[in-house]
Amino acid sequence: MPKSKRHSLSKFRNWVAYLIPLGLLVLAIALQAVAPPVLTQLQLMVFDEYQSLKPRVKTPLPVQVVDIDEESLAQLGQWPWPRNELARLVDVVSESGAAAVVIDVLLSEPDRLSPDVLGRMLPDWPEYQAAREVILDRVSHDELLAQSLSRANSVLGFALDDDHHDEIPRMKAGLVKAGDPPDAFLPYFGGSISALPVLAEAANGYGAISLVPDADGVVRRASMLVSVAGHILPTLDAEALRVAQSASTYIVKSTNASGQQSFGSSGGVVGVKIGALSVPTDSQGRIWVRYADQISQPISAWRLLSGDFDPAALAGKIVLLGSSAAGLSRPQPTPVLGVAPALEIRAQILETLISGEFLYQPDWAKGAEILSLVLLGLLLIWLLPRLGALWCALIGLVAIGTAIGGSWILFAQYNALISPIYFAFVIVLIYLTQSLQVYLASEKEKQEVRGAFGRYL
């Protein structure tokens, strides 16, 4: 082969050797920008591990769980309890000076044990007429509970359900919007399952009781506001904070509000102000739950009804009334506690909000990762044919170690969530691809040299 032709072929091979890793780098950056589900899941797994390694330190906070636990069911009978018993519970909590009593149980059906229901079940015979009139004269259990709710700083819940289309729940507070309309950014649900109207009207607060997990079923984030059939409504957690502060309005701040920059072309929610508390959120109006690895210390519900408790344990606190009993607990997976009852998860959400220990993903994180990938990727592609695999391996390892260490420090010291996993994967992939290209090119040159010597000999 003529020398000039061999030189041209060698240059072409060199260009091809660069194009393959460059193509991989471009593809990796495009995937990072699009954020496919598998990449998102890898990042979430890293964040879960960080939370497990450094959970929130449990400190005294004004949140108290009152648990309708197995012991309470053994003492007072199986669920559902008559609503007059729930009314007594609400009264005891309120009279103990609680800042708010939050019912973490969906009460969507009338009490089947109420006198009015039982009275209507009696046969319409003359011998039952007197008994029927006496029973129907009594106040219904639902009305008794409604009276208790109206006397207390109470919060009741409705369930989010795309397949149910009850009347849209009425928001109990005002809503002020600053910046872009938040409706398009909030989690959307087609419908809801409402609480019994007489109870919903009596409560001071009314919010979505449902916990919304990520695609893998793990509850990592909690919404402050949701969109139900196009109507913005608060969650139970947001309402608990509002009622506890006797606040009357939510202020939701989105991009393009005064002093706020857009996350990009789609914009997003920046934060929600609830009374005196400013809650920084992600673009969908959610917070990351900062889990502690210690569960809350509940008070068994039967102790409140029997008077066997210290009222000071409830005074000035947000009291969550729910159940951890089997069949009632609505358990869901969490990053730190394993599978936990919804009641415990709700307590952790409120503790996160009150403690102010908010996890967040910095706006600049994605841009910084792309820039780092471009710079280090190009550097490795250029250096590998010149310095060799060993030196470039050291450079790559130092860069990956720095990314992992920096990510951990940002989490541990500043509560920032930045995953190094994709950066590390792409750098290793580019290193291996370019190393293979260099090796194959070197072997090709050796074959050509041996072939040339063979012709001379």
What are these regions (language model features)?
Residues 2-277, 311-391, 395:
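Non-transmembrane functional regions of envelope-associated proteins
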Residues 304-305, 353-354, 411-412, 440:
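Hydrophobic residues in alpha-helical segments
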Residues 303-311:
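Surface-exposed ligand/attachment interfaces on beta-rich extracellular proteins
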Residues 423-457:
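Regulatory cytosolic signal-relay segments
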Residues 359, 363-437:
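Transmembrane alpha-helical segments that form the functional core of multipass membrane systems
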Residues 278-300:
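Active-site Gly/Thr loop motif
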